[in-house]
């Protein structure tokens, strides 16, 4: 059963084909994809394919991706989740994006906090990593604010529109008990 997580303002839930328009709106937006290592979506079919990829990720126990829904408007405003899940090594990488109209409202902090906590408690992770374009100042600041530590730079690690970009590597580890 797909886990539903809740915060004061948001519900993290399974993404379905009914969310295709919102996923398309997110991943066809230059401001979102600029630091994503992904070309802009050009069709709703690409959004449906991404939703199916998210479902397979969960079914195959390689990760999980939640849709971020506002409680007040029921609007899907982005996604967050884990990929590169390695249960044996108790680690995963976190990824997230929010549609620009909803930036600067504290939503990213709210969901990162919830998902990191879930990763440590429910999934038994001891390490959560993040890889972020060095140019993505907002996400770099956010991860530090959320308690992640910068571990280094991966040179020419991701390509965006055929151009290589350096990325910062971050991690947060479960506090020792």
Curated annotation (Swiss-Prot):
Q: Does the keyword Lipid metabolism apply?
A: no
| Keywords of the record | Acyltransferase, Transferase
- The UniProt transmembrane annotation reads none
Known Pfam families for this protein? Answer: Acetyltransf_3 (PF13302)
Q: Where is the N-acetyltransferase domain?
A: 10-177
The record's Gene Ontology cellular component field reads:
cytoplasm
Q: State the InterPro entries in the record.
A: Acyl_CoA_acyltransferase, GNAT_dom, N-acetyltransferase
Which EC class is the enzyme in? transferase
- Enzyme Commission code(s) on record: 2.3.1.-
Q: Name the SUPFAM superfamilies for this protein.
A: Acyl-CoA N-acyltransferases (Nat)
Q: Which GO terms describe its molecular function?
A: protein-N-terminal-alanine acetyltransferase activity
Query: What family does the Swiss-Prot or TrEMBL record give for this protein?
Result: Belongs to the acetyltransferase family.
Q: What is this protein called?
A: Uncharacterized N-acetyltransferase YoaA
What is the species listed in this Swiss-Prot or TrEMBL entry? Answer: Bacillus subtilis (strain 168)
Q: Which gene encodes it?
A: yoaA
């Amino acid at each position: 059963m797909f886990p539903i997580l809740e915060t004061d303002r948001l519900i993290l839930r399974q993404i379905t084909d009914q969310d295709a328009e919102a996923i398309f709106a997110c991943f066809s937006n230059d401001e979102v994809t600029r630091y994503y290592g992904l070309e802009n979506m050009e069709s709703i079919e690409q959004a449906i394919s991404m939703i199916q990829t998210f479902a397979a990720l969960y079914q195959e126990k390689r990760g999980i991706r939640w849709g971020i829904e506002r409680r007040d408007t029921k609007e899907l405003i982005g996604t967050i989740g884990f990929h590169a899940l390695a249960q044996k090594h108790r680690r995963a990488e976190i990824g997230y994006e929010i549609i620009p109209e909803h930036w600067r409202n504290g939503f990213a902090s709210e969901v990162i906090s919830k998902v990191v906590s879930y990763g440590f408690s429910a999934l038994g992770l001891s390490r959560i990593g993040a890889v972020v374009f060095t140019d993505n100042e907002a996400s770099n600041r956010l991860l530090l604010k959320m308690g992640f530590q910068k571990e280094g730079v991966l040179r020419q690690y991701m390509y965006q529109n055929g151009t290589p970009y350096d990325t910062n590597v971050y991690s947060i580890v479960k506090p020792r008990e």
